[in-house]
């Protein structure tokens, strides 16, 4: 801005070439000029030197500056009285006596409202001077417009932040209230279902009561008939119970029918009952004691029988063991006296014995020492029962002492 003003003061407009070059320079200056922010700096305006021919314009600017300064003072007074009170909602109660000295005229609604008509007037007025004085007239208006836009932007930002905070608080409260309403709705639904169930149950009970009343009214005349039928049915059941075990009489000759037989049997049973009543068999205390003694005797007999069975089983087991031991002793004595040849004939075949011995003759005659009681006939591969040979040998060669001991064991 200083360079442009210097050029306008040092080089006056002479000739058409200068006017065209001035227009070009004016356009270039308007496109590349940088305006600094003058937020809250209305009183610190830089004064610029104007040429001698522009005295009326400077006077107009001074008058406008004085008018603007008076308007700024008024807006400051209004903002100090009203604006400060509007923006002190977050301060403490003790701060009300000494409010802070804050200059909030740039973001106050009243100052904005007052400045907007002047800005519109100043922007609408176009300077009718030369191209060198045009940038000096437009620069204050543009700076004021920029300041106004910045103040409005700040105000809108504050309002948006406040709205967001309020919206978050409202959302939290709405969610809380919605949760409470949902819980209350569930409770009311449960209560409604319970009341509906009770209503349906009462209706069913009422319907059943009406049906029962109608049935009672219809069946009340049949009460006497039902009582008589009950007595007859009880008599029939008793008769059926007494005659349900009756034997078939198809193959038995009876004089008369079954009813006559039952009458005669009933007469005999009555006679038996009378005789037993005369003898007092069923009501005496002695019979009760005898029955108790009989039950005790029965229990003792069962226990003794069980013990006898156990002892008899043990005796049989001992007898079997003794017989086994006696047989083993007799077998051992016989084997000692006879040797190993006879047992080999009992338990092994002659052919297999010859094969095991490695090609020995199959029909080998036994010597008289091996079998003294046998004849001199040729020996054959025959199997002799061990019990028969054992009994014969034991009778022939067992000493009497061993046989006596065996009989004692057996």
From Swiss-Prot:
UniProt entry tagged with the keyword Phosphoprotein: yes
GO terms for MF: microtubule binding
Coiled-coil annotated spans: 156-208
Entry protein name: HAUS augmin-like complex subunit 8
Record keywords, A-Z: Acetylation, Cell cycle, Cell division, Coiled coil, Cytoplasm, Cytoskeleton, Microtubule, Mitosis, Phosphoprotein
Phosphoserine modified-residue sites: 105
GO aspect biological process, one term: centrosome cycle
Subcellular location: Cytoplasm; Cytoplasm, Cytoskeleton, Microtubule organizing center, Centrosome; Cytoplasm, Cytoskeleton, Spindle; Cytoplasm, Cytoskeleton, Spindle pole
Quaternary structure, from the entry: Component of the HAUS augmin-like complex. The complex interacts with the gamma-tubulin ring complex and this interaction is required for spindle assembly. Associates with microtubules. The interaction with microtubules is strong during mitosis, while it is weak or absent during interphase. It is unclear whether this interaction is direct or indirect. Interacts with EML3 (phosphorylated at 'Thr-881') and TUBG1.
Family that this chain belongs to: Belongs to the HAUS8 family.
Low complexity bias (residue ranges): 385-394
Main location: cytoplasm
Modified residues (N-acetylalanine): 2
Function of the protein: Contributes to mitotic spindle assembly, maintenance of centrosome integrity and completion of cytokinesis as part of the HAUS augmin-like complex.
UniProt-annotated stretches for the region Disordered: 1-104, 118-143, 353-410
Bias-annotated ranges (Polar residues): 373-384
Cellular-component GO terms for this entry: centrosome; cytoplasm; cytosol; HAUS complex; mitotic spindle microtubule; nuclear microtubule; spindle pole
Record bears the keyword Acetylation: yes
């Amino acid at each position: 801005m200083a360079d442009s003003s210097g050029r306008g003061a040092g080089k006056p407009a002479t000739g058409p070439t200068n006017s065209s070059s001035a227009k070009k320079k004016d356009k270039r200056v308007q496109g590349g000029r940088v305006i600094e922010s003058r937020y809250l700096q209305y009183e610190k305006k830089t004064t610029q030197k104007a040429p001698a021919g522009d005295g009326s314009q400077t006077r107009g600017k001074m008058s406008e500056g004085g008018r603007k300064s008076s308007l700024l003072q008024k807006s400051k007074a209004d903002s100090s009285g009203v604006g400060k009170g509007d923006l002190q909602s977050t301060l403490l109660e003790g701060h009300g006596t000494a409010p802070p000295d804050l200059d909030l005229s740039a973001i106050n609604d009243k100052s904005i409202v007052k400045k907007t008509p002047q800005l519109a007037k100043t922007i609408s007025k176009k300077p009718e001077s030369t191209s060198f004085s045009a940038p000096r007239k437009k620069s204050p208006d543009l700076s004021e417009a920029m300041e106004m836009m910045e103040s409005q932007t700040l105000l809108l930002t504050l309002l948006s932040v406040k709205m967001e905070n309020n919206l978050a608080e409202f959302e939290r409260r709405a969610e809380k209230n919605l949760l409470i309403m949902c819980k209350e709705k569930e409770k009311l639904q449960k209560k409604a279902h319970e009341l509906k169930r009770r209503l349906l149950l009462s209706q069913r009970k009422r319907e059943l009561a009406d049906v029962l009343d109608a049935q009672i009214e219809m069946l009340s005349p049949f009460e006497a008939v039902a009582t008589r039928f009950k007595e007859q049915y009880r008599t029939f059941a008793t008769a059926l119970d007494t005659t349900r075990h009756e034997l078939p009489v198809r193959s038995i000759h009876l004089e008369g029918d079954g009813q006559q037989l039952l009458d005669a049997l009933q007469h005999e049973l009555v006679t038996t009952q009378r005789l037993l009543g005369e003898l007092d068999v069923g009501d005496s205390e002695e019979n009760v004691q005898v029955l108790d003694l009989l039950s005790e005797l029965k229990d003792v007999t069962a226990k003794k029988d069980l013990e006898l069975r156990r002892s008899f089983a043990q005796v049989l087991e001992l007898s079997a063991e003794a017989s086994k031991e006696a047989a083993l002793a007799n077998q051992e004595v016989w084997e000692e006296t006879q040797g190993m040849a006879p047992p080999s004939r009992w338990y092994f075949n002659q052919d297999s014995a010859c094969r095991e011995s490695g090609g020995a003759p199959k029909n080998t005659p036994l010597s008289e020492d091996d079998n003294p009681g046998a004849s001199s006939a040729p020996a054959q591969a025959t199997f002799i029962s061990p019990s028969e040979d054992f009994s014969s040998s034991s009778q022939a060669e067992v000493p009497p002492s061993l046989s006596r001991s065996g009989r004692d064991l057996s």
